[in-house]
Amino acid sequence: MRVIVLGSGVIGVASAYYLAQQGAHVTVLDRQTGPAEETSFGNAGQISPGYSTPWAAPGIPFKAVKWMFQHHAPLAINLDGSMWQLQWMAQMLKNCNPQSYSQNKERMMRVAEYSRDCLKSLRETTGISYENRAKGTLQVFRKEAQLEAVQRDIEVLQECGVSYELLYQDDLARVEPALEHAKDKLVGGLHLPNDETGDCYLFTNALAQKAKELGVNFQFNQNVEGLVVEGDEIKGVRVNGQVLKADRYVLAFGSYSRDFLKPLALNLPVYPVKGYSLTIPIVQPEFAPQSTVLDETYKIAITRFDQRIRVGGMAELSGFNLGLNQDRRATLEMVTQDLFPGGNMAEASFWTGLRPMTPDSTPIIGATRFKNLFLNTGHGTLGWTMACGSGKLISDIVLSHQTEISTEGLSLQRYSTAA
């Protein structure tokens, strides 16, 4: 079977790898010069199934109003002039209730936990390396109210069978020794020992090489213009003025998937949520993290690679604007220096990317009303966490194999738009 995968971020490359592993003849098309050149390039580096939590949660509307008046707020809304931005925010608000939150979190954790298993198996069979560590994730709290509120998350973790440890101030340095100097600023934390870290860019490029060894044909610097449609079937992809044909097609264009599907009258509820990161060389290892530390107050992740610290976070609703906002950099620097001042900030690189976010925070993985078009997008901030599981899942769906986990609630059909 011939399959064309559109997109070479971590989701597209994982899809291509698992399709080829199961015998498909795969071609990957992308406008970029190589794999993982956009959203997968500079993300926070955490692989955290236990923190697969919907942004649409009870209390978020009230918090969003508060954040509008804070200098170092984790969320910023800049109207982009589109009706779609307002519609997307309205859909998200509809999910800010306990019932929707629980349903969405179950779906997210289902994919994320499966993805961790797939990644582990991939490492064992291929020996793939990407500055990876398996030392868990530590969420730290600066306020007693945060420590008290985490009980709701603990209940969900218990229901899902996720290992955790609730820590108090004097326990934090046992997990992250460099926090000893900063413990007076913190009241406690939640440690998930089974979470992992790694450089998504390195991983995606290494996996692309392994996909090539399975016969995957990567075509970069391509102007992918659109799909050729006949009835309920895709007949080809228009690329550089020509038409490339396959038996089945997988769309993994991230935030750009929605506009790509507009000519097909498929209303894909994916909005680009802008995030930022700093990559900082380590000069004092004793003041650097061992794994990932999440600052609950500022919603920022600080992750250890080999000789670098990756600091990522923020959520900015501003359309497809890729400008680097220096106020966001100031926030990332402030939080890093406050907790882990072991890096050379003068040599840090500043980056931004667009996360493809759905209103319910759950990715869109599955078929459409076109019998040979499939979607693998909308992973938001969890593309790295969910990549391998999403790739394996879509490969099974495309090839009509029995999936290893339930696909309930993952396809476009969960929205009112015809899929």
Swiss-Prot record:
InterPro entries in the record: DadA, FAD-dep_OxRdtase, FAD/NAD-bd_sf
Cofactor(s) needed by this chain: FAD
Cellular compartments per GO CC: cytoplasm; plasma membrane
EC number: 1.4.99.-
Keywords assigned: FAD, Flavoprotein, Oxidoreductase
Pathway as given in its UniProt record: Amino-acid degradation; D-alanine degradation; NH(3) and pyruvate from D-alanine: step 1/1
Catalyzed chemical reaction(s): a D-alpha-amino acid + A + H2O = a 2-oxocarboxylate + AH2 + NH4(+)
Pfam families named in the record: DAO
Binding residue positions for FAD: 3-17
Gene Ontology BP terms: D-alanine catabolic process
Source domain of life: Bacteria
GO MF annotation: an example: D-amino-acid dehydrogenase activity
HAMAP family assigned to the protein according to its UniProt record, in alphabetical order: DadA
Role, per record: Oxidative deamination of D-amino acids.
NCBIfam families to which the protein is assigned, alphabetical: PRK00711.1
UniProt name for this protein: D-amino acid dehydrogenase
